[in-house]
């Protein structure tokens, strides 16, 4: 390759390339592909600027033969190929004389006609991939990007190709020639792959030393060496008679394998009983926000200051009254608790300087709501181990609940788009490896699909509430601290917005173990009338606290504003996971990625761009009684995200059990659909294991009903 480069490019280019590599401590004799790539890039930059001039009238002209009389100025300033110090000097002087914004990275050329810097790219991959890579790296609207490939493709910012057709054809022809010359010498494949960084790993590498000893120690019984075990595993025919295989593995197993046919599975039995109720730590679709746009008040960012500012945007407060009592609670206490919050916020405003945190007075209503002094007294085991009738409390079996329609509505709402963006595009450093570039391209596409999704709002709300509650639990263990429930977003126009959903009052929080519970009372604004679905609000006491004017198509209407109040609890470990809810974005992105990978391996090229930009294609989203639901790729992203977010919001032992056990049945059904003739033993036991998780949890019940829809359609 080195010989080829020295024959193929002129000496000036070779000298510049060697200098550039030396500057980065690289050796042209060793990194020959890099050497070739740098020479090619330099040559393209020079060809791009060759013969292009600006005449006395400031018009761009092409002059191929040197006319010494013409007063011509070069149209392009070449920056590439100069040493870094000199290059920056040129860039700075251009910026000073033209007033153009200074680029963050060194560009390749400056165009005096269009007054812009140009970044030239030469790629052995697809132009759009490399284009996005460049755009992501320089993150500047001002620098123009122009990419050429060795296959004659090109791509430029806003499809503005700067040069005339003929000049560009010269560049493309030269690149094509280089490619053919390389191919004829057998150099092209290695050169093409070196940009991708493709590597193959030897199938079976030798294990030596400590690793070898560990491998030998960790073999199953009856195997003398790793080779011995490997031979056994390799010879283990998977598609033989399963009963024989089982008995070969253990003498105690005697299983009768039953064939699993389309008629074998039955639907899961969902429990009967009163409808299930809302159990999330904060309101979801029913939440109402009091918001301020472009917050710039004193103390902006301090939750209490923000909350007071948001409260002041609402003028419809009225004397609160109970509209839906909590069946088991002392409802007047919930009412008094809200009045106390209002009064204490008023007190803060009357003070000279607003404090950063607010601890509530320990009134009887708050003590009751937070379960103060309710915990049974702990006695040392030594003192009571001789008590004859020592026994654990009898705990009631949970009452079975039936699936209610509200949880499906909650899920549908979580998949919808809001008119605000809840996450910023992460500032992640520039991509170094090609794989990183594909990753950031996928991340950017995915973020664009989910940044406005309501599930993303729930993530940010969950992260905020859990962080604030965990902080307060550690910092103010004995205090009843008032914690505003806040989120931040950006409007369509890009303006910042701070939202207040309501307040939490935290109880005593001496949390020694991960599972020790801190009680809290949540008070959340809403426009939902609880009397429409009273079963959903079983655990809440709901007050009517004001009237809100809403703009509708028919003009302004007044709607009652409600406050949903309940006692709740959480633990250190739950708050820790709540703070990490952003992981849901990652989980759903990985699921989308595996879809892209499947598509790409069929087409043998990266399909990210087509995957997200082909708006006409429909993808399966889920099963409903109507059949397989389909939607755009954006809808798939948002549905996967909502599922992940609900798994976090409604996390429970019932969900863990249901997910693990139902997956086994799912795999058997999939095998049947793929005509793999699955066999099963003790299918009844599997159904039992799944159904013992279907008790009263709304999210688990909804998943079970989806599972039944899937069974129906899968086995048609």
From Swiss-Prot:
Mn(2+) 2 binds at residues 80, 108. Keywords: Cap snatching, Endonuclease, Eukaryotic host gene expression shutoff by virus, Eukaryotic host transcription shutoff by virus, Host cytoplasm, Host gene expression shutoff by virus, Host nucleus, Host-virus interaction, Hydrolase, Inhibition of host RNA polymerase II by virus, Manganese, Metal-binding, Nuclease, Phosphoprotein. It holds the Pfam family Flu_PA. Its EC number is 3.1.-.-. Phosphorylated on serines and threonines by host kinases, including human casein kinase II. GO terms for molecular function: endonuclease activity; metal ion binding; RNA binding. Mn(2+) 1 binds at residues 41, 108, 119-120. One of its GO terms (cellular component) is host cell cytoplasm. A motif (Nuclear localization signal 1 (NLS1)) lies at residues 124-139. One of its GO terms (biological process) is cap snatching. Binds 2 manganese ions per subunit. Its cofactor is Mn(2+). It is found in: Host cytoplasm; Host nucleus. The keyword Manganese applies. It is an enzyme of class 3 (hydrolase). Influenza RNA polymerase is composed of three subunits: PB1, PB2 and PA. Interacts (via C-terminus) with PB1 (via N-terminus). Plays an essential role in viral RNA transcription and replication by forming the heterotrimeric polymerase complex together with PB1 and PB2 subunits. The complex transcribes viral mRNAs by using a unique mechanism called cap-snatching. It consists in the hijacking and cleavage of host capped pre-mRNAs. These short capped RNAs are then used as primers for viral mRNAs. The PB2 subunit is responsible for the binding of the 5' cap of cellular pre-mRNAs which are subsequently cleaved after 10-13 nucleotides by the PA subunit that carries the endonuclease activity. Belongs to the influenza viruses PA family. This is Polymerase acidic protein. It comes from Influenza A virus (strain A/Duck/Czechoslovakia/1956 H4N6). The gene is PA.
């Amino acid at each position: 390759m080195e010989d080829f480069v020295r024959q193929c490019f002129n000496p000036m280019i070779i000298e510049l390339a060697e200098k550039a590599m030396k500057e980065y401590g690289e050796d042209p004799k060793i990194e020959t592909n890099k050497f070739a790539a740098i020479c090619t890039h330099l040559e393209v930059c020079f060809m791009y600027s060759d013969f292009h001039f600006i005449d006395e009238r400031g018009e761009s002209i092409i002059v191929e033969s040197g006319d010494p009389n013409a007063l011509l100025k070069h149209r392009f300033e070449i920056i590439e190929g100069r040493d870094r110090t000199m290059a920056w000097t040129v860039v700075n002087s251009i910026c000073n004389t033209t007033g153009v914004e200074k680029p963050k990275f060194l560009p390749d050329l400056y165009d005096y006609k269009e007054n812009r810097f140009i970044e030239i790219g030469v790629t052995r991959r697809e132009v759009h991939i490399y284009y996005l890579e460049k755009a992501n790296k320089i993150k500047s609207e001002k620098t123009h990007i122009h990419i050429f490939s060795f296959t004659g493709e090109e791509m430029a910012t806003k499809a503005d190709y700067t040069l005339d057709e003929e000049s560009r054809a010269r560049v493309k022809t030269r690149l094509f020639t280089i490619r053919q010359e390389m191919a004829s010498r057998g150099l092209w494949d290695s050169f093409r792959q070196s940009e991708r960084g493709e590597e193959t790993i030897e199938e079976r590498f030798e294990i030596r030393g400590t690793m070898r000893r560990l491998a030998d120690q960790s073999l199953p019984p009856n195997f003398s060496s790793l080779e011995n075990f490997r031979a056994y595993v390799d010879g283990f025919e998977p598609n033989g008679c399963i009963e024989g295989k089982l008995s070969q593995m253990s003498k105690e197993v005697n299983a009768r394998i039953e064939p699993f046919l389309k008629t074998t599975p039955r639907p899961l039995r969902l429990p009967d009983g009163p409808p299930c109720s809302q159990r999330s730590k904060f309101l979801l679709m029913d939440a109402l926000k009091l918001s301020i746009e472009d917050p710039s008040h004193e103390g902006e960012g301090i939750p209490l200051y923000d909350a007071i500012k948001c409260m002041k945007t609402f003028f419809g407060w009225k004397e609160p009254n109970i509209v839906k009592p909590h069946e088991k609670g002392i409802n007047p206490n919930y009412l008094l608790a809200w009045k106390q919050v209002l009064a204490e916020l008023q007190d803060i405003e009357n003070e000279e300087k607003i404090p950063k945190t607010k601890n509530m007075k320990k009134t009887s209503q708050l003590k009751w709501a937070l379960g103060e002094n309710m915990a049974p007294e702990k006695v040392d085991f030594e003192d009571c181990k001789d008590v004859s009738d020592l026994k654990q409390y009898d705990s009631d079996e949970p009452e079975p609940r039936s699936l209610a329609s509200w949880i499906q509505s909650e899920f549908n709402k979580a998949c919808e788009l809001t008119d605000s963006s809840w996450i910023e595009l992460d500032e992640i450093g520039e991509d170094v490896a090609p794989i990183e570039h594909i990753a950031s391209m996928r991340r950017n596409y995915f973020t664009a699909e989910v940044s406005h999704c309501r599930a993303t709002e729930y993530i940010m709300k969950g992260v905020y509430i859990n962080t604030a509650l965990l902080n307060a639990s550690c910092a103010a263990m004995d205090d009843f601290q008032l914690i505003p429930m806040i989120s931040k977003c950006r409007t369509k126009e890009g303006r910042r917005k701070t939202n207040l959903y309501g307040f939490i009052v935290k109880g005593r929080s001496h949390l020694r173990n991960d599972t020790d519970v801190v009680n809290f009372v949540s008070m959340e604004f809403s426009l939902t009338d609880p009397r429409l679905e009273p079963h959903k609000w079983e655990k809440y006491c709901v007050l009517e606290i004001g009237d809100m004017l809403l703009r509708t198509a028919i003009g302004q209407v007044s709607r009652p504003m409600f406050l949903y109040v309940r006692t709740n609890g959480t633990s250190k470990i739950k708050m820790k996971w709540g703070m990490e809810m952003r992981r849901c974005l990652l989980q759903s992105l990985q699921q989308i990625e595996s879809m892209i990978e499947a598509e790409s391996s069929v087409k043998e090229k990266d399909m990210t761009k087509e995957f997200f930009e082909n708006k006409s294609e429909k993808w399966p989203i889920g099963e409903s009684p109507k059949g397989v639901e389909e939607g755009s790729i954006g809808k798939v992203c948002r549905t996967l995200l909502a599922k992940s977010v609900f798994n976090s919001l409604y996390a429970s032992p019932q969900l863990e059990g249901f997910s693990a056990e139902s997956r086994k049945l799912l795999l058997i059904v999939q095998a049947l659909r793929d005509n793999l003739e699955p066999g099963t033993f003790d299918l009844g036991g599997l159904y039992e294991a799944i159904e013992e998780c279907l008790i009263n949890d709304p999210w688990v019940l909804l998943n079970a009903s989806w599972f039944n829809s899937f069974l129906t359609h899968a086995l048609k």
